[in-house]
Structure formats: structure tokens, C-alpha cells
Amino acid sequence: MSKPVRLLWGVHAHQPVGNFDHVIDDAVARCYHPFLETLERHPRISVSLHVSGWLLGYLNRKFPDDVARIARMLRSGQIEMIGGGDTEPVLAAIPDQDRRAQLRALTLRIRDLFGVRPRGAWLTERVWESSVVPSLHDSGLRFVAVDDSHLRSAGITGALDGYYSTEESGKRLDIFPISETLRYLIPFAPAADVVEAIEQTRSGAAAIYFDDIEKFGIWPDTYEWVYERGWLEELFTRIEASRRIQTQTFGRFHRRNASRGLVYLPATSYTEMNEWLHGGTWMSFLLRYPEANWMHKRTQGASRRFHALPRSQQAASMRDALHRSQANDGYWHGLFGGVYLPFLRASVYANLADLDEQLDALAPRPPSERSDIDLDGREEIALRAGPFYAAIRPSEGGRLCELTDYPLRHDFADVLARREEDYYEVIRHGGSAHPERRRMPGIASIHDRVAFKVAIDP
């Protein structure tokens, strides 16, 4: 008898630091709660679950019953917890010592809540740079999942239905390739089509899926499709009935199967990033949006000041503010606004102001100083007076880069210039972003839609 296909099913849950409570509560009602409730009714379905630390803390405070449900499924072995950065930073974009602290913070949060330590990590936005390998390895994390296109770009051919290994400075990390086919089928195609696609995987190999849980209820039309019309219930029932499919957690598959071999990946992120930025590397957002680069370099400077303090003075409140300022959401944009959303940028500046004020109480800065704050080769002048911090750029006629009021935790110079975006062409022509991927029956992925809450004049 042939060996079954091993379905590795992972979901990732995250809400931006600084998001509105009512938005998170709606996500719980329309996505997190019904997904977990449906999953618990199907104990033969194994899932690897990543929840960002900031969101996990929120759920534990406001929705303890859902956290208790996770704990029950952990104890039964139905799910495993996946680690990562606590506030969902792009690991490649923050200093190594902060990477390790962020990874440790979520590991400890999971240990304290559930009594387990994760062995795998979620890479924020699946941004890959080899520099993250030692940080992950030394943090006790042994595997990550990235898009299968990452491995294709490294020259791997053939079926991507197992995991590979890489190393940096002699420290190994294993890499699971996420199937693009499954990402575009789940949850948009009929459940029968999804099961058929999984069953086409060769015997004994892995069908690998890991993607945002918010696709299951928050993305357009998905709540009705996934829950009210019973798509998720049907999918789990069909998987359980299949003689070809056996679900496993990533960790169990990792323990029981050998690596396919060594691979070295180029610096990259997921395929869709090319729709928002040519080149597909996340760090290039900092070049396209100088406002994001300013926040990023200000956060890096605050990190250096924090780590320059004696260990005994590095308060937990400082580290928390630093970690919150490193949350990825306000530094770039994809489908959901990101740097274009003022409240996400405001969250970064609020946490920077909190951290700077605490640092100044221990290590005051001079009233004025010249330095290249944003590392673009041109000096800025930083001014401090009373409750205010200001940064001026002489090379641009004395332009004000930042005017932060510490008591208000607000930067009054936090504005964003309007820029032409490539995807405006889709808006102008009123078409689908990916007409070649549109299929019936089922529902359209958000990547294939052109829809707006308000009218846009590109």
C-alpha cells in the first residue's frame, strides 16, 4: 500500500501593534474564534499555529476561552505552536541582539502560557536574508517556512515536497517550501478541488501550506464562504475521509524525515511583493519611502542607546517600547495600507517617544547635535528643548523631519508624500490584478480584486 501524502497545514495570526480594539475584536469574531472552534471539532486535523506575541497577549487578556481552546489542542497533540519575533518585526531589518530578544520574548510567552517551547519560527512577511540564520539557530529554533519560489530562485528543481537545509557561519536551519498552488487555492477554490490538488502530491511526500489565518473570515467574502457556507467544515471532513491524506504538524514531519539537502537562498520575500515594489526585497521599501527609512533609522538609534546602558538599567518597559517600535506594519505596505495608514506610523513614533524619554532620564542627550540620523550620507540637526524633540535637514533648506512631543507621544511632522504606484494602472483600467488566475467556481482572492472603501482618483 502506498504511503499517504503528509499535509502540513500552518496558519499565521497577527494584528498590528497599535491597531484599534474593535478591529481586533472583529477579527476574533469573524476569524480566530470560528476557525479554532471548527478545528477542535476535527481532532484528526493537525495544524501548526503561529500567533504574534502582541496579539497572543491581547487574546489572553480579552478572549481567554480561545486561548484555553488552543491549550487543549496543544495538550492533545492536534496543534503545535510556532515561534518568531514577539511584535512581528522583519527580523532581517533589526539588529542581531534585538532579533534574539524578540525571538526569546515570544518563546517565553508561549512557554509561560502553554508550557511548551516552539521549535519552528514564522518569518515575518517571509522576508529571507541569511543573516537571520544564526539568530534563529541560537534561539533554539530549527525550521522556518518560506515560499517555494525562494527555493526555485536558488536553482532547486523538481517537486518541492519536503524540507531543505541551509547554514550561516556553520549554524544550520531547515527550510520548508510553501506551495504557491495551495496558497492560491485555499480558501478560495471549492473544498473538493483543494483535496484533489493535495492528493496529487506523490506518496510519502509533503503538501505544504502556511499562510495568514485572516484569509479564513476577514478577507473579502471569506466569512460567508468559509463559515456560513461551510467551506472549512467541508474541507476538514473531506481531508479526514481521504485515504491519501494524513495531516501532520511541521515539527512532527521535521523530526521523522530527513532533509533533502543543502540550499543557499537569495535575499527575497514572497512573490506578491513584486506587485508593490520591483525587486521583491523588503528593505527596498525604505528607499522608496524615506518616511519609513526615517522611522527605521530612528528605531535603530534608540536600540543602540538602549543596549549601551548597563544591563542593570535596561528596564523591561524600555525593551517593550523598543520591540513595539520594531513591529513591521508601519514601515511598508502590501494589501492592507501599512505605511500609508497614519495610526500605524503614529504607533511607531509613540513607542519611540516612550523609549527616548526613558533613555533620556538615564543618559541625557545634548540640547543639539549634528549626525547622519537616517544614514543617507547627509547630516541632520537634532534639537531638544523641554518636552520636544526636533530634527532638521540643512541639505534640504532646513526641512523639519520630525517634531515629537514626548508627553503627547506624537510626532507633528509625521506626514507621507504621495507617490505614483505601479498598481495604479490596474485602478485606471478597472481590471483584475491577476486575470490569468481568476477561475470559477469559488471566490476571488484579494490579490485578484480591485475594490476600495472610498473612491480613489489615481
Question: Regions from the language model: what does each represent?
Answer:
Residues 32-39, 67-71, 100-110, 133, ...:
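Generic structural signal for well-ordered alpha-helices
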